[in-house]
């Protein structure tokens, strides 16, 4: 074998040489040369975080390193905030940007760009979280609000009346109708009997753009210098109350520049309003806390080294303005309503009205108003102007032509408010021939000069001034002057002072002077709380007509979840007999009852009242308290007597069918509804115990807390020697979650079947098996089984 091997070696060498020569012939496939190190490093693509002037943009972008330079797409640079005039199109070689310094942080995988300061625009930083829009919930149902009232006055007689509101609501909107019926008793024939309809209205809301459609009996929109009228027709307009998350007036914005990451604290009029974090670069603080009037904002910035800089910035905020670009207004078309509250269907001539407001800038809001009828044309314009930090001026002018008479109205005013004092004035001047829809359908009566008697006042002037004196209380003064076209004047001067005393007690002093009569009305009142729900008051009053009186009053308020309330009062009157008053009230979740008496000796009036609502929803009929706006129905899946809380206040328990109606709900506010599960059976399983939702206006919604019964039990597990299985042992079941053995061998098992094979693994790895058989539990009580013997080797 050794000889053979030596003989094969030359042949093998020849074969290898031939083969090698054959593989190297031209035209045959060949392996590529090994890459050079320089070629490998010429180009590489990284996913890097982009940082501008120490500010982390939050962007992770592809960056190409080619021949020692960094390339990035222009779109990514623009997204990061670089100005377009400095960014070439396409792929950008950062080295070509002569004013940009580039640094690659390989450890943190970041690309650091240092830019000129004038390249970076101010970043808008919300100071506080913007209140999110809450999607309103709504259901389908109907309700009947009612108010039954009756009284009887000695020597005069009595009457009974029933007020109602019938309302239907669904996903499209709501329909409501209100009215009352009255019946007079013997001796009280002076008041109208029968049924009187008030309003019948279809309401459709759009919360996304804060607009409403109304059809039926509507009220026209008005500005501060115009009048509203009742009409039968349609109305469309903006309604910002549908969006409580919106701030419609301009709030101050504070701008600056931070060289390094910085925290900023805001103090408004000496009180800390909050804080936020700032990244390096120019910034603009927005979404500041709600403030009003004049004041000073102090910004205190603190950098990473603890260095602080304080800046004081004055401001003036008023809700009379609209934000820039924001508009408000409404249009109403129909027929003027006549004899409201007297006749059911009495409509006059056709008419139309429209108002509009627009925020031109943060310091200027323009207003416009127009009215029209067959013999009326009215147009007007106004402005609201902020004078820097020195208050707000409003002006308006209207011109009308009604039944051949021309007239104008001009109004102007000024308001200024701070935390220490406020001042306001408002003035109106009118021509005799000025008219609008409020006068258009009035009975036309002329005086001896052939002038219509029904008209507005010629001049109106109002002045008010208030001071906050700190521990010495608050004082206020107001003067109102009205002059008619026949030169009759009404001039009133009002003065007031109030101050908090010990605890929550307070004192109030007020005086009013009629300039034409030359007399004063004076009142002094002392309020003293007596516990959580009780209070007492002492009042001294002197009037020109009634003389002097001294009044004592005691009040007990009703708990939020129902109960009793009462009020007692007595007054000594110098020009008449003593006055006495007593009221007793009681309320539960179904109804509110009140009754009492008031008056003087031999002239007492006794009265009683029952208020509530009847609601149909989710196939259930409910008796509830009066529902002024929205409501919810709590459902606990048929479980009775479950306590319910609304905004952390107890409001009652579910009925026998597992329902509770909560009537005092504010529309569009995301309120909290919570149930107390302590009294539920132990085998009850819940997905949630609290929900926070908002309800649409004039609507109701079913707030459901789904529950299901689950077979649960405790089991005691022992070994064959009668000893409890070790703590921490794992109890396994097929298609079920593992359970853990606690002290005394007790394990809590859920989702049980009739027969449940158990496998137990102790902490040392030993295994044993047992079988748990569960019986019926119709009362859903917590049951404990065992001890069961867990045997090895089964």
Task: Give the residues covered by each predicted segment.
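Short, acidic Ser/Thr/Gly-rich low-complexity loop/linker segments typical of extracellular
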Residues: 649-658, 735-746
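Short Pro-Gly-centered beta-turn/loop motif in secreted/extracellular proteins
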Residues: 64-72, 288-294, 659-685, 743-758, ...
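Post-signal-peptide, soluble extracytosolic/periplasmic N-terminal scaffold domains
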Residues: 2-16, 24-248, 544-615, 623
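A short, amphipathic beta-strand motif
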Residues: 50, 256, 632-636, 711-720
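Extracellular beta-sheet/turn segments enriched in Thr/Pro/Gly and aliphatic residues
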Residues: 110-114, 317-323, 689-709, 773-794
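Feature captures outer-membrane beta-barrel proteins of Gram-negative bacteria and organelles
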Residues: 134-136, 160-172, 193-207, 348-362, ...
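Short, ordered, surface-exposed loop/turn motifs in non-cytosolic proteins
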Residues: 41-48, 56-61, 638-648, 721-734
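Transmembrane beta-strands of outer-membrane beta-barrel pores
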Residues: 148-154, 181-185, 217-221, 262, ...
């Amino acid at each position: 074998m050794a000889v053979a091997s030596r003989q094969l070696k030359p042949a093998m060498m020849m074969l290898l040489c031939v083969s090698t020569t054959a593989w190297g012939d031209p035209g045959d496939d060949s392996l590529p040369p090994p890459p050079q190190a320089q070629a490998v490093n010429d180009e590489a693509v990284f996913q890097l975080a982009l940082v501008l002037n120490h500010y982390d943009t939050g962007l992770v972008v592809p960056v190409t390193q080619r021949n020692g330079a960094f390339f990035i797409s222009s779109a990514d640079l623009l997204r990061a905030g670089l100005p377009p005039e400095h960014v070439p199109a396409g792929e950008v070689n950062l080295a070509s940007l002569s004013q940009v310094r580039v640094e690659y942080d390989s450890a943190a995988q970041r690309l650091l760009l240092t830019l000129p300061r004038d390249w970076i625009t101010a970043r808008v930083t919300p100071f506080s979280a913007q209140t999110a829009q809450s999607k309103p919930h709504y259901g389908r149902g109907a309700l009947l609000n009612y108010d039954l009232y009756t009284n009887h006055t000695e020597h005069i007689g009595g009457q009974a009346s029933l007020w109602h509101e019938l309302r239907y609501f669904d996903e499209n909107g709501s329909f409501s109708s209100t009215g009352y019926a009255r019946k007079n008793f013997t001796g009280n024939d002076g008041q109208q009997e029968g049924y009187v309809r008030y309003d019948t209205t279809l309401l459709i809301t759009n919360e996304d753009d804060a607009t409403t459609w109304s059809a039926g009996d509507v009220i026209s929109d008005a500005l501060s210098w115009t009048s509203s009228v009742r009409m039968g027709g349609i109305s469309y307009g903006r309604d910002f109350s549908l969006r409580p998350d919106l701030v419609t007036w301009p709030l101050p914005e504070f701008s600056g520049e931070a060289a390094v990451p910085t925290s900023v604290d805001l103090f408004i009029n000496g009180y800390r309003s909050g804080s936020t974090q700032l990244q390096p670069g120019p910034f603009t603080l927005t979404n500041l806390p709600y403030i009003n009037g004049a004041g000073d904002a102090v910004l205190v910035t603190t950098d990473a080294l603890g260095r602080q800089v304080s800046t004081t910035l004055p401001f003036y905020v008023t809700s009379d303005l609209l934000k820039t670009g924001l508009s408000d207004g409404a249009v109403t078309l129909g027929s003027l309503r006549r004899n409201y509250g007297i006749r059911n269907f009495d409509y006059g001539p056709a008419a139309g009205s429209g108002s509009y407001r627009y925020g031109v800038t943060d310091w200027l809001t323009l207003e416009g108003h127009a009215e029209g009828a067959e013999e009326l044309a009215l147009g007007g314009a106004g402005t609201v102007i902020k004078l820097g930090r020195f208050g707000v001026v409003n002006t308006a002018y209207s011109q009308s032509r009604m039944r051949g008479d021309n007239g104008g109205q001009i109004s102007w005013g000024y308001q200024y408010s701070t935390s220490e004092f406020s001042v306001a004035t408002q003035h109106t001047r009118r021509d005799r021939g000025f008219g609008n829809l409020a006068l258009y359908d009035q009975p036309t009566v002329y005086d001896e000069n052939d002038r219509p008697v029904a008209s507005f006042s010629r001049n109106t002037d109002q002045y008010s001034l208030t001071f906050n004196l700190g521990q010495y209380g608050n004082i206020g003064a107001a003067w109102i002057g009205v002059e008619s076209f026949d030169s009759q004047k009404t001039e009133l001067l009002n003065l007031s002072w109030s101050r908090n005393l010990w605890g929550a007690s307070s004192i109030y002093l007020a005086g009013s002077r009629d300039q034409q009569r030359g007399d004063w009305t004076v009142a002094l009142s002392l309020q003293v709380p007596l516990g959580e729900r009780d209070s007492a008051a002492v009042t001294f009053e002197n009037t020109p007509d009634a003389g002097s009186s001294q009044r004592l009053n005691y009040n007990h308020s009703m708990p939020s979840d129902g109960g009793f309330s009462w009020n007692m009062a007595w007054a000594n009157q110098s020009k008449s007999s003593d006055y006495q008053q007593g009221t007793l009230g009681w309320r539960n979740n179904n109804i509110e009852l009140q009754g009492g008496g008031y008056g003087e000796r031999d002239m007492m009036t006794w009265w009683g009242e029952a208020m509530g609502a009847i609601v149909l929803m989710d196939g259930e009929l409910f008796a509830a308290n009066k529902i002024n706006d929205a409501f919810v129905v709590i459902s606990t899946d048929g479980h009775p007597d479950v306590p319910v809380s609304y905004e952390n206040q107890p409001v009652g328990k579910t009925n026998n069918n597992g329902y509770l109606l909560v009537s005092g709900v504010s529309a569009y506010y995301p309120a909290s509804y919570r149930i107390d599960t302590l009294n539920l059976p132990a085998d009850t399983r819940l997905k949630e115990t609290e929900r926070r939702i908002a309800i649409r206006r004039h609507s109701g919604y079913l707030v459901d807390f789904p529950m299901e019964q689950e077979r649960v039990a405790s089991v005691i597990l022992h070994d064959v020697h009668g000893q409890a299985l070790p703590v921490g042992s794992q109890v396994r079941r097929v298609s079920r979650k593992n359970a853990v053995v606690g002290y005394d061998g007790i394990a809590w098992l859920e989702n049980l079947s009739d027969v449940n094979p158990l496998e137990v693994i102790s902490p040392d790895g030993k295994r044993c098996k047992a079988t748990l058989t569960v019986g019926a539990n119709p009362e859903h009580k917590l049951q404990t089984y065992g001890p069961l013997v867990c045997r090895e080797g089964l």
